[in-house]
Amino acid sequence: MFIGVCRLAIQIPDARSLKDRRRVVKSFKDRVRAKLPVSIAEVGDLEHPGIAYLGLAVVANETSRCSEILSAVVSMARVVPDGILADVRTEIVSFGSGGKGIEHGIEASLSDDAHGDFDEDER
């Protein structure tokens, strides 16, 4: 399993208010969600009308598929009406089956007796 993450910075030079910025961001997020299997959210500097930071995540069974989807998002971001793509950061990581993730896998974490002393009567 591979997880692709991307952080976009989109400048919105004509935004005079947060409402102007939200209009541009919502339109972009809706278009991305309609066309691509990604999760997308604003991730920083929510109070500045002139720039929006968006985080995206995708899960796929091949790195090439993650890369293809993230590239499609970046292509869409390059043509955002009223926006200018200012920065892009992407990373694809392997998880499970030889990849790095939770040490010894989530199964080991779940089988640990971390909650062994929990007594339901103590609620």
What are the functions of these language-model segments?
Residues 2-123:
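Long, contiguous binding/interaction regions
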